[in-house]
Each structure stands twice: as structure tokens, then as C-alpha cells.
A protein has these predicted regions:
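Donor-binding and catalytic core of enzymes assembling or modifying cell-surface/extracellular glycoconjugates
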Residues: 53-139
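Glycine-rich loops and low-complexity Gly/Arg-rich segments
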Residues: 44-48, 86-90, 108-111, 154-159
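Compositionally biased, intrinsically disordered/low-complexity regions enriched for serine, proline
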Residues: 4, 14, 57, 129-131, ...
Length: 170
């Protein structure tokens, strides 16, 4: 099923290699989601991407986000260095792009989980995957069930409520 829905994720790359960073903002900025899942601070995600890039020879970092304008507002450093915002327009495009990353910093959302799973299980070369911990704002027993053994956890830092405007107020 997956191969039929996102065939490019399983084909040889045609674009230059990159590291993927996924930042879920959008509805995570709303009060109803902030206390349950909460947005991870985008500057932390960029820093983790930068560390992966340095570790692996300086490949560019491609940011996948549902809120490019908010991400750029929160991370002005995005205009310098080897960063780019993905032009993926659908969830399938984003999933494909993230799964093709040579290393990947996940967000706490199932789209990220599936991209990391596909990258880890279907790529011939090992893929460094950094997974957020805890997955929810409040740690849960499920946190131990989510990662694959080869994934590395990173300690989440939540985006402060004052850092971004609530999209429903715009």
C-alpha cells in the first residue's frame, strides 16, 4: 500500500541529498493541542539538524512544516546557512520528502513517525533518526513503545506559549 501511495520514497534519488527536519506548528499552537502534544521549539529542531549536518559532512537542511511563515518568524537564522523550506504541498509530498532524507529530525506527529519508519526500513544506507521525547507534553508509557531500536531520542523543548501567535486569532 505505501509503495503505491508514495512511490518516490522508494525510488533512487534524483535530487541532491539533504537532511530533513520536521516542525509541526499549525494546530499545535492552539490551546486545545498545546497542553496535550505541544509544539517543539523550532530553534531546537534547527540546532539538531545543524548537528547532524556537521556530523555527516555538511549536507543542506530541508525543513518540512505546515506553517512556513510561522517557522520563519520564529527562526530568523533560517535565512543564513544551508537551510531551505520544503515546497511540499500535500501530506504525501511531505511524507515522501521526509522519507528520502539522509538523516531526519522528527516532530511528535504520526506523519514524522511514518517518514522515519520508511527511511529506516527501506533505505539501503543507515539513516540517523532523532525522535522527540517525550512524545506528549506529559511523559507516558507509550513513549517507550514508539521508537525503533536504531532511533536516537532527543529531549524536547516546548515552544513557549508567548513565542507564536495562535493561528485561530489571525
Amino acid at each position: 500500500m505505501l509503495k503505491s501511495r508514495i512511490p518516490l520514497a522508494f525510488q533512487p534519488e534524483t535530487d541532491a541529498p539533504y537532511f530533513g527536519v520536521h516542525s509541526r506548528l499549525g494546530d499545535y499552537l492552539n490551546d486545545s493541542w498545546r497542553d496535550f502534544l505541544g509544539p517543539t521549539d523550532p530553534s531546537l529542531l534547527l540546532e539538531l539538524g545543524r548537528q547532524l549536518s556537521q556530523k555527516h559532512g555538511g549536507l543542506p537542511i530541508r525543513v518540512f512544516t505546515d506553517s512556513p511563515a510561522v517557522f520563519q518568524e520564529l527562526c530568523p537564522e533560517l535565512t543564513t546557512g544551508q537551510y531551505e523550506i520544503s515546497d511540499a504541498v500535500s501530506s504525501w509530498d511531505a511524507l515522501t520528502g521526509m522519507a528520502r532524507s539522509h538523516a531526519f529530525v522528527m516532530s511528535n506527529i504520526t506523519l514524522s513517525w511514518w517518514a522515519a519508519f520508511i527511511a529506516t526500513t527501506y533505505r539501503s544506507d543507515p539513516v540517523d533518526v532523532l525522535m522527540p521525547f517525550p512524545w506528549h507534553v506529559t511523559p507516558d508509557r507509550a513513549d517507550d513503545l514508539l521508537p525503533l531500536p536504531e532511533w536516537t531520542r532527543y529531549e524536547r523543548r516546548l515552544l513557549p506559549a508567548s513565542a507564536a501567535s495562535n493561528p485561530s486569532e489571525e
